[in-house]
Every structure is written in C-alpha cells, then in structure tokens.
Amino acid sequence: MAKLYFRYSAMDAGKTLDLLKVAYNYEDRGRKPLVLTSAIDKRAGLNKVKSRIGINQDAYSLTDRDNIFEFVENYNSSNKIDCVLIDEIHFFTQEQVWQLAEIVDELNIPVICYGLRTNYLGQPFETAALLLAIADTLEEVKTICHCGKKASFNMMVQNGKAIKQGNPIVVDDDSLKEIDTKYVSVCRKHWKEGVYE
C-alpha cells in the first residue's frame, strides 16, 4: 500500500542527496521514479535537482499553479511510475500537498516529499505544517549546529548579522552571495541568540 512520506530537516542536512539516492535505488532495480521540484528554486537550473556536493538529476520543475495530481496521472498513463519524489516541498502550496495525498490514495503511488520544516524566521512553512499533520510517515534528516547539537533551525546571516525579519521565502542562490548573505543550520539556542559560528 502506497504512503505519503515527509522527510524534513534544517538546511544542509542532505535532503536532496537522499532524494537522489532513493531515485538511484529505484532505477537500479528497474523501477521508474518521477522526480519533481519547485520552479522557484533555480540553483540547479530548471528541470534539475542538484545536491550541494554536486550530484544532480533531471526533474520536472513545477509552479505553485500546477495541478500535481493531474501532472502525475497524465505522466503515469504513458510512463508507468513506481514512486514520486519531490524536492523543495516547502515552495509548493497546501492545495498541492492535498493533491499529493490524492496520488497516494487514488493512484496507489508512493510519494516522498523532501523539504524544510521552518523558514529562517523560525516559522513553519504552511506545506510543512500540513505534511506534519497528514503524512503517513515522518522522517527527520538530521544535521548539526556548529556547537555539535542537532540543528533544527535555519538562520539567515547578512553582513555577519543574523536576520530575524523580512520575506519568509528567500531562495539560497548566487544572488545572495553578492549581498554577503548565507543560510546556516543551527540549534534552537543559537538561533535565538543569533550565533552562527
């Protein structure tokens, strides 16, 4: 029986790397995964997912206006798929999360979502909150803070200072480097204190 999975973490924990590993394992066994990502995240270019260590794979980039259920149903009618893997789920909508549940329930295809639980303001992404409520299986992908504790928060650092206000969605791409901005995964204590190294 198919399930809806949510694998979440702070940034730099290896979510995309895990997605690529799962896709490889399916393909290595003669199965067909369908890899989807958000068109908002253009770090690897459109129609591609790429881990921070450089491994990449072709994918379909979807917008928040796309009906994922219809996309998967149409794709599956001509290319039998065994699993749907979604990177950057936090950039999708709650309606699309319900469409993913429909893929599991109506098409009996497992769906594995990878994404952030919270933004750099410490607030949950709406899609993450919904997935935490409705996913059949929740799995935390763990990483560590500079202090050695588990990192569960994302901190935006600009010109050496922690940022705690602004647009909740800022994509980590090359444009941030131009304004000396980066994201750092930290524990709750260091997120509250604004300490990132």
From Swiss-Prot:
Alphabetical UniProt keywords: ATP-binding, Cytoplasm, DNA synthesis, Kinase, Metal-binding, Nucleotide-binding, Transferase, Zinc
A single MF term (Gene Ontology): thymidine kinase activity
Annotated signal peptide: none
Catalytic activity: thymidine + ATP = dTMP + ADP + H(+)
InterPro entries (alphabetical): P-loop_NTPase (IPR027417), Thymidine_kinase (IPR001267)
GO aspect biological process, one term: DNA biosynthetic process
Transmembrane annotation, as ranges: none
Class of the enzyme per the UniProt entry, highest EC level: transferase
Gene3D superfamilies, per database record: P-loop containing nucleotide triphosphate hydrolases
Binding site for Zn(2+): 145, 147, 187, 190
Quaternary structure (record): Homotetramer.
Entry protein name: Thymidine kinase
